């Protein structure tokens, strides 16, 4: 059997620029004590985390300019295969500012608009990668779409995956998420805010999160996970399937940026290994927790994940 491959699609990647400083003062000059740059964007985080879990991961991304080239270099150095699709728009930079108190401020640049011909070529290349992956593969679509790209791009990819026997996992927001859910993906992963925006109701408690997941299932998804920050996550399956909640232990957090993406990587890896139920959500939660102490978003370590597995509290609701 062909080794399963996890295709991580990134239509709007970026460079994660992490700045550390004593404190951030708005309206004043702020000097950083250190600065680091990491290949980023949600799908990049998924690809790196999946690779750490010994999965064969492929990162398919719009990339432009010197920053895009640096992202390719970094991802390839980690062992991730990169399918770089040229974009006339320079790859964006996302700032993550960490002060001495541990407070994190994120400033995310908008993604530049690729040309219409570039968007079409991106879609066609994704379809070829889906066809080449075979039925043992998995499609993971993460992040927002760049300006100028139709909200139905992800729908086309979900349909291509279905036609080739691949399950599709989606983590997005806004109109792209709404349309993707209606396209009936196998799995949807959203955070609390994204769930609230999608269904138009509050998602503050566990019962509300379960209700939101069930509503997303009614709209088309087969399985839904909603991440709830330090409270963990819930996972609901269609057809009156089991409802699970997982909660990680209290941790020393460096940064939670990318933890939802690492969680998605855990679910994706579980799917390619045939792991289901309690063991799947335990692995996903351990990946999300491991990301909190990682050197950069998505760069989890397998040893850390393994050490966290027995510490994850899993409950069937």
Report residues per predicted region.
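Gly/Ala-rich phosphate-binding loop of Rossmann-like dinucleotide-binding domains
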Residues: 51, 162, 272
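Conserved phosphate/ATP/ADP-binding segment of small-molecule kinases
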Residues: 152-243
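Glycine-rich phosphate/adenosyl-contacting loop at the front of the ribokinase-like
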Residues: 1-60, 69-70, 252, 317
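Short beta-strands and strand-loop turn motifs
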Residues: 106-108, 136-144, 171, 189-194
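Conserved N-terminal subdomain of the carbohydrate kinase-like
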Residues: 52-137, 307-317
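Glycine-rich beta-alpha junction loops
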Residues: 11-15, 63-64, 89, 194, ...
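Conserved phosphate-binding/catalytic region of the ribokinase-like
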Residues: 178, 206-317
């Amino acid at each position: 059997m062909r080794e399963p491959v996890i295709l991580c699609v990134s239509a709007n990647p970026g460079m994660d620029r992490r700045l550390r400083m004593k404190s951030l003062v708005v309206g004043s000059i702020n000097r950083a004590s250190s600065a680091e740059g990491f290949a980023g964007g949600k799908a990049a985080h998924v690809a790196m985390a999946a690779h750490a879990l010994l999965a064969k991961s492929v990162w398919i991304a719009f990339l432009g300019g010197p920053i895009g080239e640096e992202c390719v270099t970094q991802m390839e150095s980690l062992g991730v295969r990169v399918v770089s699709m040229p974009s006339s728009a320079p790859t964006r930079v996302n700032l993550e500012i960490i002060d001495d108190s541990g407070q994190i401020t994120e400033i995310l640049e908008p993604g530049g608009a690729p040309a219409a011909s570039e968007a079409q070529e991106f879609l066609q290349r994704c379809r070829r990668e889906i066809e080449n992956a075979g039925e043992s593969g998995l499609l993971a679509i993460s992040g927002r779409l760049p300006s100028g790209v139709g909200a139905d791009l992800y729908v086309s990819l979900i349909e291509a995956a279905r036609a080739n026997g691949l399950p599709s996992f989606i983590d997005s927001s806004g109109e792209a998420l709404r349309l993707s859910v209606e396209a009936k993906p196998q799995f949807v992963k959203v955070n609390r805010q994204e769930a609230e925006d999608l269904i138009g109701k509050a998602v503050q408690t566990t019962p509300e999160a379960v209700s939101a997941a069930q509503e997303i299932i009614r709209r088309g998804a087969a399985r839904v996970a909603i991440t709830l920050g330090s409270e963990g996550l819930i996972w609901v399956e269609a057809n009156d399937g089991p409802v699970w909640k997982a909660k990680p232990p209290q941790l020393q957090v460096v940064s939670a940026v990318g933890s939802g993406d690492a969680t998605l990587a855990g679910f994706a890896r579980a799917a390619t290994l045939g792991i289901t139920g309690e063991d799947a959500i335990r692995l996903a939660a351990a990946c999300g927790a491991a990301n909190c102490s990682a050197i950069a978003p998505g760069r989890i370590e397998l040893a850390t994940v393994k050490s966290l597995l027995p510490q994850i509290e899993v409950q069937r609701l």
